[in-house]
Amino acid sequence: MSVMASLQDRTDGTFAGDEWGEKDTRFLYGALNALSLLRLLDLVDTELAVKHIQACINFDGGFGTSPGAESHSGQIFTCVAALAILGRLDLVNKDKLGGWLSERQVPNGGLNGRPEKLEDVCYSWWVLSPLAVIGRLHWIDKEALIKFILKCQDTEHGGLADRPEDMVDVFHTYFGIAGLSLLGYEGVLEVDPVYSLPKTVIDRVIGKRSWT
């Protein structure tokens, strides 16, 4: 874990993905996720990490990969989840962000990652997770999204694709099922929206959280 902690830049709070230094909020979230589960957040400067996340907030309430980068659902997940881990959800404009995220739903019920892009099953997680954390999950049409996700199934061999009729893969299968969990779909184990792990596991490891 000391290696992971060493990847934080102590001048601006960012985290690199490796020794060669590429930085963005994905690496920040990944580090905070792992360190918090091991109760080792004291190895990094969490206040500086929060300041960096604040610098990534955009006028539309969303977050980008770095300060000034456009809002994207995947990066919003990493930033909101990181703030949840650090107990700083007070920094999120929940109504503004909830509005931007709910606008990601397109007419066929699916969700896209940013304006004018195609829908994709994986955004059933990247969009729904922050909506769940900020208490705005009811701002989308849940039934329409469930229908879209189920249409992306390979009913013969199993699995989920990014869109109906496309090839299934593990990535989209996982995030599609995780999205169904957040939607309360019957028979799917409850997933924690911050850690993307079974809620029973998170409750056992670090206790019940305020966002659940």
Residue ranges and their predicted role:
Residues 1, 9-12, 46-50, 94, ...:
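Core helices of alpha-solenoid repeat scaffolds
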Residues 1-14, 21-47:
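Hydrophobic, ordered structural segments
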Residues 2, 29-32, 51-54, 77-80, ...:
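Register-specific detector for alpha-helical tandem repeat solenoids, activating on a conserved position
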Residues 4-21, 53-74, 98-122, 149-167, ...:
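Glycine- and aromatic-rich loop/turn segments at beta-sheet edges
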Residues 22-26, 44, 70, 74, ...:
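Residues within HEAT/ARM-like alpha-solenoid scaffolds
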Residues 23, 36-39, 71, 84, ...:
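Tandem alpha-helical RNA-recognition repeat domains
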Residues 26, 30-33, 74-81, 126, ...:
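Alpha-solenoid helical repeat scaffolds
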Residues 82, 87-107, 119-212:
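Terminal, non-catalytic domain-edge segments
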